[in-house]
Design a protein with these regions (language model features):
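Tandem CBS (Cystathionine beta-synthase) repeat/Bateman regulatory domains
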Residues: 1-154
Length: 154
């Protein structure tokens, strides 16, 4: 693996080259979520508060028992909010704005393959899911990939 030391405001770290990077090297760990009923205004405030460009939209998966487990069934991006805001409707729910189903990638997937999938699906964001647990572990954006392209060795 070819690595390059990159200086940042917070110190330095090793950046993999684009040809050797995986989704885990570029993704943002953790995800910001909203309920399917959240309004455009509420989703916009969540994005602004957390300085993110997308949120995962949750719905409740109701099983046969008393327990309920939230599942991610879509992604709303900042461009979705702008588009909906221009057409009016600040009270529209996130469920109406979400891209469904979300593009899902694994952390070990080569970054080039993830980028190809994102381009093919027209998805600026992909949900990163750990296959062993089927749990979301992060979000990958096109800007995350650009960061590797910009700072990793060619």
């Amino acid at each position: 693996m070819s690595l390059r030391t990159t200086q940042t405001i917070h110190g330095s770290y090793l950046m993999p080259s684009p040809g050797h990077a995986s989704v885990a090297d570029a993704m943002h760990p953790g995800i910001i979520t909203c309920d399917a009923e959240a309004t455009l205004t509420e989703v916009a405030r969540t994005m602004a508060t957390h300085h993110v460009h997308s949120v995962a939209v949750l719905s409740l998966a109701r099983g046969s028992g008393p327990s309920e487990e939230a599942e991610i069934w879509g992604i709303v991006s900042d461009l979705d909010l702008i588009s909906a805001g221009i057409r009016g409707g600040p009270e529209r729910p996130a469920a109406d704005l979400a891209h469904q189903p979300p593009l899902i990638v694994e952390p070990t997937l080569p970054l080039r393959e993830a980028g190809e999938l994102m381009v093919a699906h027209g998805a600026p964001h992909a949900l990163v899911v750990e296959p062993a647990t089927n749990r979301p572990v992060g979000m990958l954006s096109t800007l995350d990939i650009v960061g590797i392209l910009a700072w990793g060795e060619a």
